[in-house]
Every structure is written in structure tokens, then in C-alpha cells.
């Protein structure tokens, strides 16, 4: 089977490519970082529309997709237009689109505007957030898979630490509701560190949180930092309408304790108080963190249980998830399928 993987050559995209390449050696890579290097392109992509770049986008695919493939696999690529996708369909039996973001909300402004136009021409859309189900009927998506965010063996297994010297951490980008959340935790007396982008944009709470905020991390650094802390706080993106995130799987995969906002779906994946800790408010999060830090055996037991659930019982390693995706039979299957765990 011949596969063309299209996506940026960094972060989770690169690890997704390596997972597919491991399953299917005859896999080529088309790097879309070409677009990300152009600041003017990025500005128009986020703040207006890409119509003035349509010729450039189409030329990129015309010059780089010349061979025939069994599957052309897009990895969360917003830089695609209808004209290009119609030309690409001539080169493949199937077009798969792995959608890591939420292209149906306004959080990323105009970045995903073109995606809605190409939906009818994609053979299979893969969502790794269960909450995307609500958009499937609305946008008339005929063929889709819903799975769970993967972890990467080569990243997360290499960073499992038995001894964790630091206490509480949050790793993530700033959003307005997050500044208030951590201000409440600090006001109550909880000690924590924050790693991530854009926290200095919080005009109201940054001055109170400045000493807690560390640098932004790349993907491999993220796994190392997760492994150093006893408790990793997980917050869902309100603008992205999430009910689970990649971090919810990565934290237990790295052997640390997940303390996350409570959702019905998360409780199905990781049992509350046995494999993860959940909260519905800053006050509940504070109380649970204080209790756990006084009872480190509980932290250890829950961390171990969560790690076993993600790694052994559910087997959420990327290679296993992509194997299910590549083996998905578009002809014999029903119009929709959810990979259940």
C-alpha cells in the first residue's frame, strides 16, 4: 500500500507520520511547513481569508503530489482549498483527514474557513475528540471515525519517572478563563508552576501569576516536565468545545497523576478517584490537590492505575490507533463508526 502523509514536520504531526511509517514502510511525507514560514500568509489565514493565496496553495500541491497513492492522509492541515482537493483526488483511491483541532468553532478565527468547503470530497474524517459528534450531523459528514487522543511510545515511555520531586503543574496555552482559575488557586495558597504561551496577555491576572509562569515548551520538553511533577492539572479548551484533550492521555502515559476538569466522557476512559482525579471548580481542584499532597501513596496508586489503563488495558499508543484507522474499510462499513474503548 502506498500512502502520502501531508502535514507539518514537527510536534504531534511528525510523530503521527512515524507511527504510520512504522505500520506501512511505503509512506511518503509532504511537509506543509512551507506555509508556516510565510508571516503574511499566516496573518491572512488567521485574520481574514486565504483567497489571495489560492494560486500559491494550488501550485504547492500540483508541484508536490505527482505520484498515485492508495491513501493520501492529511494531518490537521488547514492550508487546502477545493480546487486542490479535486486535483488530489485524481491521484488517490482515498483521502483521509486527521482533524486534531475543532474546525467548526471560532477559536482559531478564519484558520479553518476552507475546511468546510472540502468536507464533501474527503473519504474519511478522523476526530480524536468525542465531543465532535455534535458537529457531524450539522455539517453532513458522511464518513468519519471518532477515536481517543494517542500517546507516543518513543516520547512518553522514555520520560516515566518513579521519583517526582515537584508538586503541581499546568502545561498549556493561556485563555481568559484559565487566568482566573489559577488566580483562584493561588489566592487559596496552592503552589504550582505554569508552562505555556501567551500568559503575559492576561491583563487582569498576569501580575499575580508572573512568578509561577515558566517558559513555553516543545513537544519533547512537555513530556519531560509532565514526568517531574506529582500532580498535572488538565484544563479543557472552552473555545475548542473539548471534552477530552491530548494531555488527558499523555499525563497518565508518562506515569503522572491527571487532575482534570470533569466530563462524562473522561470518566468513561479513566475512572474517577482510581485512575484520575476530576474537579468542577477551582475550589474543588484546590481541595483535592491539598489532600493528595498530604497523602502521597494515593498519588502513587492513582498514577500507576492510570498508566496501566492507558498503556495496557486501552492500548492508546499511536501505532495501535493508526492501525485501526488504516484498516478502516470504507466500502463494507456503515456510514459512521466510533472506535470504542
Which residues does each predicted region cover?
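Short amphipathic alpha-helix with an adjacent loop that forms part of the alpha/beta core around
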Residues: 61-66, 291
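Short, conserved structural micro-motifs that define repeat-unit consensus positions
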Residues: 74-76, 88-95
